[in-house]
Amino acid sequence: MRNSCWKGKALKQLTFHLKRNSAGRNSSGRITVFHRGGGSKRLQRKIDFKRSTSSMGIVERIEYDPNRSSWIALVRWIEGVLRPGKRLAFSKANSRREKNMFFFGLLFSFSSLPRQAQRIKYEKTRALRPCEQILESSWVLGTRDLRAKEVSLGPLGSFLGLPSIAVAGAKPAFFAFRMKGPSSLTGRERLSPLRGENTFSQSEGQRWKTQSGAPRRKSLVLSWSQGPKARNGLMISAHDIGKKDRRPEMAGPHTIPEHAPRALHAVGPSGSGRVLRTSEPFTYILASENLEVGNTVMNFHGSKPSTLLNYHQPSQKANDPSGLRVEETAWDSQAWLHPRGDYASSENKYILDSYYQMVGNCIPLAKIPIGTWVHNIERNPGQGAKLTRAAGTFAQIIQKVENTPQCIVRLPSGVDKLIDSRCRATIGIVSNLNHGKRKFNKAGQSRWLGRRPIVRGVAMNPVDHPHGGGEGRTKGGRPSVSPWGKPTKGGFKTVVRKRRN
């Protein structure tokens, strides 16, 4: 993992600047912040400590972050891009589109589609009319090849057997391309013999848009062979030309696979095609030790907090690769994540499947066996990781309290802390174990990290430090204190272990 650490530029969409230009001084020139380092001028990486993205992700690369001691991992999330509420809206939009398929079949023509389009096989079952029972058709876009089972309805033919993706991407008939007629004809005579019965003139097209009220579908689900295209191969509509693509892109020689779901296109409540985006497909997480490029990481999402204390038994769908698809609902795609039975009552049932034993997975403490090394621990459920985030650190689960949703975790400092079992933690040790063992051969290496020289308190003025001032080299006086007057020697307690009334 150490040799595979990538030290190139980070994703611009996942970085931000700390707008601090005071250099640690206030308006009077007094130093208010000591040893700030060089972090104020660096690009800060946005680390996802909440791990609130989709449930499955692939590690694209391990990066070096100059702002923290550990390494970070760039994860591309491949499952559950849309939240459950968005998935429901997307399914309702599909049902509305299927009901209006016949209407679009009368208004749209497929004669203008290129012949190089992909062949689509589609099966549909409808129970609306006797003639719309089971239609199995194979449609070659740009041609008029239909099987015998295709039903012909209306002057423009029936499109009930066509997939909805093709109907959404069809061009209106009055936008069909028109070639010029013979040179012997002039004016409108050159266009009149070439204008078919299924095409409109410019004036007829305007009347059709205003009088019929037929909506014009703008969708990016079908790629045309001509026209401007985005980087992902999708057609750009007229109103999107010139806009900047704000989707995160990979820097350097790394490329993004074509099958990675970035966003799903659906029809919103207003009826116009729009893109549903909930969370970015790329996020930074703290890299665990032994986490390599290409590994799969998982985020646990429990719909009911009460079920987090139950025992987990993987279902048959866990081993089915077809279960990890975006088209499924959130409950179906994560059904094997929901535990069953009693878990905290017996210590003989601490059995986890392979997903729970993988390094880098973020799951609740109630689902982790006793003795497991964890990091990135939450203090409150859903708050985000607050404990054990430094390089090479780890905590250990010591005990799980019976009949209560709490467990005891031993932190790197040796303190045993009682934490809610619904809080999530990441399995493994924080990466970059040798961070504390490095040696600086010269003072410049420390300055490269943004660390300024340490100035003694006796060398300062009285206004800057309690030990400052005096004639010549002064010794003695008060015990060693910090610039704010707190004792710095041993024996001074800074943490209150127990509070008593």
Swiss-Prot record:
Pfam families: Ribosomal_L2, Ribosomal_L2_C. Keywords: Mitochondrion, Ribonucleoprotein, Ribosomal protein. This is Large ribosomal subunit protein uL2m. SMART domains: Ribosomal_L2, Ribosomal_L2_C. Residues 464-474 have a biased composition (Basic and acidic residues). Residues 187-217, 459-501 are annotated as: Disordered. GO terms for biological process: translation. One of its GO terms (molecular function) is RNA binding. Belongs to the universal ribosomal protein uL2 family. The gene is RPL2. GO terms for cellular component: large ribosomal subunit; mitochondrion. It is found in: Mitochondrion. Residues 198-213 have a biased composition (Polar residues).
